[in-house]
Amino acid sequence: MFDPAVFAARRDAFMKVLGPSGVAVMRSLPERLRNGDAFHPFRQHSDVFYLTGFVEPDTTLVLRPGAETERIVMFVRPRDPEVEIWDGRRAGLEGAKETYGADAAYTTAELPTRLWELIANHEELHFSLGLDDQMDLLVGSAIARLRKSEKRGKRPPRAVVDPRVALHELRLHKRPEELVALRTACRITCEAHVAAMKLGRPGVSEHEVEALINYTFRKAGGSGPGYATIVGAGDNATILHYIENTRAIADGDLVLVDAGCEFGHYTADITRTWPASGRFTAAQRKVYEVVLATQKSAVAMAKPGVTIDELHDHCVRSLTEGMIELGLLTGTVDERIADSTYRKFYMHGTSHWLGLDVHDVGAYTREGKARPLAPGMVITVEPGLYIARDAPDVPAELRGIGIRIEDDLVITEAGNDVLTAACPKEIADVERACAR
């Protein structure tokens, strides 16, 4: 969906960081078997996509900023009319050059024989060890061959550096075209959540709600969910990453849905919790109001200069106050934070980066300190309370209640812009959306 110039600009920015003496080798993962001879749907490695827009498996990108020729080299699957009848069209070598910006393109099968020359005589090799055993062996073999060739003027790189440090810094700061994709993903996701609220009444199964959500993603032009859709009814909502989605929704249940559409490889990440009956009970309303007030105040805090740690600390304090008011905890707020007892009911972080990956890349610290938010960063804000059905020493009417409210924000010069504002979260708006 992006113009080739977008990917060219990204490569230029990354190669500027590499410098003329650096060479980067980046590999997509191969297709993975699901079972038998059936494969999982392939999704390109986010780093490779960010730099190329190329979506086929078995791809290797080599960047050589200081080279006079072959600065951008791609190893790809060749065109094969017979195979393409079965598995779909390929870009091939010409497509890699004409469409994806490669100066030179070779077949994936040629990588073992050509890699050593491409990395020769560079000071630093930027390569991520430990991600792909086969690729580690290829790179190791190339370096070993160069060590044997030093007397003939072909020397190996002096150091191996992880390219993700520099590349993920670029990915952390979203460009305008990325925000367009994220806004679209968020808009579609909001539509899917509202549709789920209307469907998810007693007697409907969790998997029916999941099916409607994923259908809405695809119908609106998304590629599908950016991660496994969570539909947790009743006490299933107290399981953070519940993805079985097999239970029938019962009268009196709350339904927690955590779902995000992927659009143009960028994913949204929204959580909403709503009453299957269409109206919150008094107990559900009390817990929901605690989470909602906490979430809204944290969203209001998010601006340049504030850290994710500060957002989390704020939510911990606000939720702990609520836990005491609800009768979940006793003592003072400071005592319960100091001994971490609050983690019985709020055990996860408040925010994470969002982008090509649902838990997107980028360091949360700089020079040992929490990193301040800056314009162009996209984050989630997602506090919650999870009261297990067998939780001891808590009011009986609160057991089995799980509530999370999550929005996606882009940090701006003036503060933040909530990308998911169209998704209902106020009690009256949620109940209105649930009306059938």
List PLM regions with ranges.
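Active-site neighborhoods and metal-handling regions in enzymes and metal-associated proteins
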Residues: 1-436
